[in-house]
């Protein structure tokens, strides 16, 4: 049986791929592996961006493997512990200080949307994507942060529309409501995600982390608290070798070459 969890690094960009065709259901141990590996990935100074995708071009993920949930709950000791682990993994992605990019193609349902919601960039295929949180049709609710993160990304009205009606949207509608930052042809999707990761990898590391910390953090803070975070970010990055290089490059009308400080 093929390993449903694939990991690789190319040009400072780490890629996690679900590999369980055709629907790429996320097995219980996929999350176990992410929880084990993400701390090392996020602390590695040579990894400057992360891409979450899936093998092939059929589907990103149709969600969690529901048949494995009872086994996962038994191993975790309780439903609360089982889902707490999943929230820990998404919190690491969202708050880890490394830009995370997700790809939407084919089915992106349930956990196949909730994991990307913890990422900082989402790119969709221009054809064939079916994105949604269908838990209402199962008599349940999103269990992996979907009802908390989706309204922060697209607003309350669109989130209620998608969740209460279990409505699936395509890539173009996802772009219109702000769920994704861009839409590209399916055959270009993975290359575009890699290219974006490589572009982000050239940016000054401390400044990237400071911006992520400030913008992600502002969603749960007051304006005054967020401004204080920004002040601290400015103080931490101003005067670093990379900021000096950026200023010099601007004045000399050339492209900066950062040393990743």
Segments from the language model and where they lie:
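Acidic, divalent-metal-coordinating active-site segment for phosphoryl/phosphodiester hydrolysis
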Residues: 110, 166-173
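Terminal low-complexity tails and localization/encapsulation signals of metabolic enzymes
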Residues: 1-2, 248-261
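Conserved CoA-thioester-binding segment of acyl-CoA-metabolizing enzymes
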Residues: 1-53, 91
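CoA-thioester-processing core
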Residues: 89, 93, 103-104, 109-163, ...
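Glycine- (often His-adjacent) and acidic-residue-rich active-site loop
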Residues: 54-92, 108, 222
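C-terminal long alpha-helix characteristic of the crotonase
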Residues: 124-129, 180-228, 235-236, 241, ...
């Amino acid at each position: 049986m093929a390993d449903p969890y694939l990991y690789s690094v190319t040009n400072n960009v780490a890629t996690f791929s679900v590999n369980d065709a055709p629907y790429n259901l996320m097995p219980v141990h996929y999350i176990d592996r992410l929880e084990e590996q993400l701390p090392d990935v996020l602390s590695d100074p040579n990894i400057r961006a992360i891409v979450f995708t899936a093998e092939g071009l059929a589907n990103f993920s149709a969600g969690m493997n529901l048949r494995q949930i009872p086994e996962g709950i038994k191993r975790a000791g309780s439903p609360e512990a089982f889902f707490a682990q999943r929230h820990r993994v998404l919190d690491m992605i969202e708050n880890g200080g490394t830009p995370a990019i997700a790809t939407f193609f084919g089915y992106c349902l349930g956990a196949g949307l909730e994991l990307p919601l913890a990422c900082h960039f989402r790119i969709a295929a221009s054809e064939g994507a079916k994105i949604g949180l269908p838990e209402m049709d199962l008599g349940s609710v999103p269990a992996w942060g979907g009802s908390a993160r989706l309204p922060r990304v697209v607003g309350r009205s669109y989130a209620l529309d998608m969740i209460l009606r279990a409505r699936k949207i395509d890539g173009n509608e996802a772009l219109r409501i702000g769920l994704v930052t861009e839409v590209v042809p399916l055959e270009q999707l993975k290359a575009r995600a890699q290219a974006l990761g490589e572009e982000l990898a050239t940016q000054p590391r401390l400044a990237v982390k400071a911006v992520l910390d400030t913008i992600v953090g502002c969603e749960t803070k007051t304006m005054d608290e967020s401004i204080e975070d920004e002040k601290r970010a400015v103080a931490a990055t101003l005067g670093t070798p990379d900021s000096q290089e950026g200023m010099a490059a601007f004045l000399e009308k050339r492209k900066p070459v950062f040393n990743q400080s």
